Regions:
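Charge-rich, intrinsically disordered N-terminal extensions
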Residues: 1-427, 431, 481
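Short, basic (Lys/Arg/His-rich) helix/loop patches that form interaction surfaces
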Residues: 563-603
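Basic, Lys/Arg- and aromatic-enriched nucleic-acid-binding interface segment
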Residues: 460-490, 588
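C-terminal secondary-structure termini that scaffold catalytic or DNA-interacting sites
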Residues: 553, 634-658
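Conserved tyrosine-mediated DNA breakage-rejoining catalytic core shared by Y-recombinases
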Residues: 496-531, 658
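Catalytic-site neighborhood detector that most strongly recognizes the C-terminal catalytic loop/helix
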Residues: 514-518, 609-637
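Active-site/catalytic core of tyrosine-dependent DNA strand-transfer enzymes
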Residues: 32, 526-578
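Short, polar N-cap/turn motifs at the start of nucleic acid-interacting alpha helices
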Residues: 501-505, 580, 600-621, 648
């Protein structure tokens, strides 16, 4: 019974609301509104605002069919209802009508349909339009209009909304709302505050890809992460095509994948999950590698923007840290340290704890830390099935080291791996994760025998390069000249500064920081090289603290960039490179061997190259073949040592006497 009374009350309220609307103008004859009230109640309309064009026509037919009214009376009564609706709309929706009227980016003939729809939805201002409103309008248009007309009216709604956003952004209050805020809402990209970006999406035909639903049931942390990455892409990726192909589309696929898989943290994506996502992406695009960049890009955005360092993340990005200069090689920087390859979570946590110590507390160079991480990861992956690496036995470790020693790996590399693994266990021991040392590294280390590098570049090869060097790009030319003429390491050449070259009044010198040795040295150079580099420095207005050769991001020129570019130039100009590939270090060997052939002592060459000991220098010098050849020539140039000495030529047919 109470429910019935409630229903009756609601019905009466609606009837009263309609009655009040119809009797707004007291000067209108009661017969006008009484007739209209009776008809509207009969067809279930209790709000004058909701009367549509077809309703007006049906009312006109109804009046004719009663036979009680003349044509004039029918016209007057339908006119009353139309005029009443217009008056109510002008009074109730004045702001909305004015806002639509001000929009000068759409055709006037298309505004009416949009306006009527918004009024039926009870929308009083254009700013109230959101994606849900657009969705309702699209649904209505599909039912009532042709496909082409639907697109036309939807586009009109979008233009009205975008015009209003632009106008609002011109105000102080609007500019304060310029940044998107996470509110667990549905975001339609053409409606974002920054319309310079929003208008980029006008060309997208499938508007569904522009809808980002942060109201759906999913991990709140995941939704906030996706929102943050989305905002980053909108703000920082200026090329609209690149933004769509490398960020927005793959990000949407990753978002859908994470919801389906119940993933709540992108920074903790597992290797198997990444592979599964890659399989899904492969069904959507041809260039899978390009789209899968979203995983690394997303992790980096989140890691770099955290208020605190996310040590729990499966990938650490080194840009997040401020390292002492001597720990970084600007020409070959360590970009990231990854841990997701270790799928045993407990072992990964221990590895991350150890790497946190190495990165944050030790003074090791990042290149050494990366190398160490690589060796330990390989070790942990091998023992992935062990619940915790802390439970490993020496017998199991011995088995692993035996496998290492059976591979075609240099003894010093094997020893390096054993040493790094030993340091990892030493850390676990100090931190109380294990009790005592599990193995003795000296027991498993291999004996290292001195060996010689035969890596000198043949003269005809580098002379051909020098002959055609004028055709190479400027930076490639100058880097090669420094490699060939000075014997510097490629990392040292790529990190030369504007004050590297100087004249002491008698000789030209180059000052270089040895990244590998963490020391500065000076060596003499040719006057020609000095002059060439001084001209380059002056031409490009390079300051004393600036890098001579810059990468795209303004840092030191990348080693990989040079090698790749130089190889391409050699191929372009038909230059043959011996060996499997172009190796910059070979020119260091070449210069050292050249010095030795000219009679320079091993000690002097050692100092020039910047080695700590002569044994390393000896490995660089290809002295044996040339020394043997020279001794051979000297020996056989002596008449008594000629092989032909004592041989008496015989005439044809003459017996030998045997």
């Amino acid at each position: 019974m109470p429910a019935l009374r409630l229903l009756n009350t609601e019905s009466q309220d609606k009837a009263d609301y309609l009655h009040n609307q119809l009797t707004t103008d007291i000067n209108v004859p009661s017969t006008y509104w009484e007739c209209a009230e009776s008809y509207l109640k009969g067809v279930g309309i209790y709000d004058v605002f909701l009367i549509e064009e077809q309703d007006f026509r049906n009312y006109k037919i109804f009046l004719h069919e009663t036979g009680s009214f003349t044509k004039k009376q029918v016209f007057e009564r339908t006119g009353f209802l139309r005029n009443l609706q217009k008056a109510l709309i002008r009074n109730e929706y004045k702001e909305l009508l004015d806002e639509i009227e001000r929009c000068n980016t759409v055709q006037e003939r298309l505004k009416g349909n949009v306006r009527n729809f918004l009024i039926r939805q009870g929308i009083h201002h254009v700013r109230e339009i959101d994606y849900r409103t657009r969705e309702l309008y699209e649904s209505e248009l599909r039912r009532t209009k042709t496909f082409s007309k639907s697109l036309e009216y939807l586009k009109t709604l979008d233009r009205i909304k975008q015009f209003d956003i632009r106008k609002e952004m011109e105000t102080l209050s609007g500019r304060n709302k310029e940044q998107l805020k996470y509110e667990g809402q549905v975001i339609f990209l053409p409606y974002i505050p920054d319309q310079d970006i929003g208008s980029d999406f006008d060309y997208i035909q499938d508007k569904s890809e522009l809808v980002w639903d942060f109201s759906q049931k999913a991990s709140e942390n995941l939704k906030r992460q996706i929102f943050q990455i989305l905002c980053y892409a909108l703000r920082n990726i200026k090329d609209s095509k690149d933004r769509r192909v490398r960020y927005l589309l793959p990000l949407r696929w990753m978002y859908e994948f994470c919801i389906e898989e119940g993933i709540d943290d992108i920074e903790r994506l597992e290797l198997e999950q990444i592979k599964k996502l890659e399989t899904i992406v492969a069904r959507k695009v041809v260039n899978v590698k390009n789209s899968m960049q979203i995983v690394d890009n997303s992790r980096k955005i989140l890691f770099m923007s955290g208020k605190e360092i996310h040590w729990y993340a499966n990938v650490w990005y080194m840009e997040r840290f401020n390292f002492a200069p001597e720990r970084v090689n600007p020409s070959n920087p360590v970009q990231r340290l990854s841990f997701y390859e270790v799928t045993n979570e407990r072992n990964r946590e221990l590895l991350q704890e150890y790497m946190k110590y190495q990165v944050g507390i030790s003074d090791l160079a990042l290149g050494n830390i990366r190398s160490q991480l690589c060796y330990i990861k390989k070790f942990l992956v091998y023992f992935n099935t062990i619940e915790s690496i802390c439970e490993i036995t020496e017998e199991q470790i011995a088995e692993y080291f035996k496998l290492l020693q059976e591979q075609e790996i240099k003894a010093e590399t094997v020893n390096r791996q054993i040493f790094d693994i030993h340091r990892f266990f030493a850390y676990l021991n100090v931190k109380g994760h294990i009790k005592g040392q599990i193995f003795d590294q000296n027991y498993y280390s291999q004996k290292v025998y001195p060996y010689h590098h035969d890596r000198s570049v043949q003269e005809d090869e580098y002379m051909e390069i020098l002959k055609k060097l004028k055709f190479f790009p400027e930076v490639q030319r100058l880097i090669f000249l420094n490699l060939w003429a000075t014997g510097l390491r490629i990392s040292e050449v790529c990190t030369l500064k504007g004050d590297a070259y100087y004249w002491d009044g008698e000789d030209a010198w180059i000052k270089v920081y040895q990244i590998k040795m963490k020391a500065e040295k000076m060596i003499p150079i040719s006057l020609v090289l000095y002059r060439i580099m001084k001209i380059y420095i002056k031409k490009h207005h390079i300051k004393s603290t600036d890098f001579l050769f810059n990468s795209k991001d303004g840092g030191a020129y990348r080693i990989g960039t040079f090698v790749k570019g130089f190889k391409a130039s050699c191929k372009k100009y038909g230059i043959y490179i011996s060996g499997e590939t172009f190796k910059t270090h070979d020119y260091r060997h070449t210069l050292a061997s050249s010095f030795y052939d000219d009679g320079v002592s091993i000690r002097t060459i050692r100092d020039y190259l910047g080695h700590n000991n002569e044994n390393m220098t000896k490995q660089y010098i290809d002295y044996m073949p040339k020394r043997i050849e020279q001794a051979n020539m000297e020996y056989f140039n002596q008449t008594e040592n000629l092989l032909a000495t004592g041989i008496i030529p015989k005439k044809r047919g003459e017996k030998t006497g045997k």
